[in-house]
Amino acid sequence: MELKRVVVTGLGAVTPLGNNPEETWKAMLEGKSGAAPITYFDTTNFKTKFACEVKGLNINDYIDRKEARKLDRYTQLALISAIQGVEDCGIDLDKVNKNRIGVVYGVGIGGIKTFEEEISYYALHKEAGPKFNPFFIPKMIADIASGHISIRFGFH
């Protein structure tokens, strides 16, 4: 197999240290930690009280509210970092062959927040029978982030 060149021309980052590459890099150079008390959910019944959460990010600065509701949080963050990367590289999407642009996005588990919400809803309403949100599977699958990035920019 012949190795091909890959060129990284733009950066995007949504991290516990910052909501863009500049903020993240600055915090890293200053030796800051992204770990802080958990605010995303009630930790009363958990031993762990600290995590590295993304803070202060307004999703709707990047993604339309209606579209954001259809996406799990991990997909929202992936899409935002991709939007930043495309903006950073300054590419003119009307002048490139989108068939030559690929999207690779790695994640260990897909939409875990969606999974937790659906299972919790089912546990509370199981007497009504199984009834899941029609976006349950599309929001959960691990490759959906790269799919939404490709859709957003028309990459093939």
Per-range role (PLM):
Residues 1-155:
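Conserved "HGTGT" condensation-loop signature of ketosynthase/thiolase-family condensing enzymes
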